Amino acid sequence: MCHAAPAAPASGRGLPHGGGNFSGAAGSRSVGATFEQRARQFLERRGLAFVAANVTMRGGELDLVMRTPDGTLVFVEVRARRSTRHGGAAASVGWRKRRRLVKAALHFWVRHGKGAACRFDVVAFEAGRLEWLHDAFRADDV
């Protein structure tokens, strides 16, 4: 389904310093929405076009769906952690989460983007920095 050439990670700034993470009971939808908005703005400044946000499909939710100038659909998982303890934000996208993302993306792709190339990226906010992981995983890896 999704095959795009891997690219090097890109970094930026954008997270307040602190400890712990933003997920679970301590987190909130508004905190998640803030990070998703910041990720969207970061990606738009790098030439990606916004397609959709918080799309619930059979199998899971897609935080952001973007499109590259060449038409590739990019399914973006946004993660935030105050520190890199416990593996950090990017490491929190485990195989179960990847499997749910691929399932949801497949349903979206069939309805809205069939025929387009696609990839899975992660935008991770941690320890005061933003890291963009292009082609973070492949559909056939899960």
Swiss-Prot record:
SUPFAM superfamilies in UniProt: Restriction endonuclease-like (SSF52980)
InterPro entries attached to this UniProt entry: Restrct_endonuc-II-like, tRNA_endonuc-like_dom_sf, UPF0102_YraN-like
Region: Disordered, residue numbers: 1-23
Top-level division of the source organism's lineage: Bacteria
GO molecular function, one term: nucleic acid binding
Any Pfam family matching the protein: UPF0102
Family affiliation: Belongs to the UPF0102 family.
Name this polypeptide is given: UPF0102 protein Bamb_0202
